[in-house]
From Swiss-Prot:
Its EC number is 2.1.1.-. Keywords: Methyltransferase, S-adenosyl-L-methionine, Transferase. The lineage of its organism: Bacteria, Bacillati, Actinomycetota, Actinomycetes, Mycobacteriales. One of its GO terms (cellular component) is peptidoglycan-based cell wall. It comes from Mycobacterium tuberculosis (strain ATCC 25618 / H37Rv). S-adenosyl-L-methionine binds at D127, D156, L157. NCBIfam families: mthyl_TIGR00027. This is Putative S-adenosyl-L-methionine-dependent methyltransferase Rv0830. Exhibits S-adenosyl-L-methionine-dependent methyltransferase activity. GO terms for biological process: methylation.
């Protein structure tokens, strides 16, 4: 179903289901078979959501070993690279003395529970109320405790999340580290720019930002993606990202941030794989997404 302007979701529907999909891939990366990342919460969170296809994926009940694009190790490797990028971003920020951290569209992200945060750190998680409530309750039922102070900001990012964040205690006068992981493609281009405008307005000099982006989201309407989606559907994965993403050129984002005083750096997904000791796949689908870009930035003004 195509997106509506004020659509809502939980972790089993629409954009929310993509958070469950990502968590399932994190669970594969964390599985002892591969042990590429440390995330003991991904698999139980996926099981708690109750989407059959992702529960079967984390429980190794989908026969995909012979399909190169759905090979579990391939999925695990890709998600490990992404997860390590954002994990290291936050750890580097702590080493620089930053003490407040904002995870936008936090989904089933458990970094507040699993990373080694310095004493006094505050992690703000911003997402839909339904998503925040589910994750908080599920992790509590699992007996998990945050590794540092965790403050939830239950708000739609299309609403006044900046005020809600400050109401939760965020201090715009001191540096912060922000992440927008797996978020930008689900925003219209103008909403993406507005998101970065808000981040800039709330950031003191020395603040840091990490995100990834697809320069041209038209790839999700490409025949290569359609072929992949059709194969996904055969296996039970019925999320059509082409109906969830907002199309448009995103390649301006680095220049946009630079004009606002951010010093940016970027890695293509191919370079990110290489930095983690992996070879990027060379099949049709991987080639289509070879310009996926991971970026970090520091506010210099």
């Amino acid at each position: 179903m195509v997106r509506a302007d004020r659509d809502r979701w939980d972790l089993a529907t629409s954009v929310g289901a993509t958070a469950t999909m990502v968590a399932a891939q994190r669970a594969l990366a964390a599985d002892p078979r591969y042990a590429l990342i440390d995330d003991p919460y991904a698999a139980p969170l996926v099981r708690a959501v109750g989407m059959d296809v992702y529960t079967r994926l984390v429980d190794w009940q989908i026969p995909v070993e012979g399909d190169s694009e759905f090979d579990p190790q391939r999925m695990a490797t890709g998600m490990a690279c992404r997860t390590r990028f954002f994990d290291q971003f936050f750890l580097d920020a702590t080493h620089s003395g930053i003490g407040q951290f904002v995870i936008l569209a936090s989904g089933l992200d458990a970094r507040a529970y699993r990373l080694a945060w310095p004493v006094g750190s505050i992690v703000y998680e911003v997402d839909m109320p339904e998503v925040i409530e589910f994750k908080t309750a599920t992790l509590s039922d699992l007996g998990a405790e945050p590794a540092t102070e965790r403050r939830t900001v239950a708000v739609d990012l299309r609403d006044d999340w900046a005020t809600a964040l400050q109401t939760a205690g965020f201090d715009p006068k001191v540096p912060a580290a922000w992440s927008a992981e797996g978020l930008l493609v689900y925003l219209p281009v103008e909403a993406q720019d507005a998101l970065f405008d808000n981040i800039t307005a709330l950031s003191a000099p020395g603040s840091r930002l990490a995100f990834e982006f697809v320069p041209d989201t038209a790839i999700f309407a490409d025949e290569r993606w359609r072929n992949y989606h059709n194969r996904m559907s055969e296996l039970g994965f019925d999320i059509d990202l082409n109906e969830l993403v907002y199309h448009g050129q995103r390649g301006h984002v680095l220049d946009y941030l630079t004009r606002d005083g951010w010093q940016t750096s970027a890695l293509t997904v191919t370079q990110l794989y290489e930095a983690n000791g992996f070879a990027y796949p060379d099949d049709e689908l991987a080639t289509a997404f070879a310009d996926l870009t991971y970026s970090s930035a520091t506010l210099m003004r």
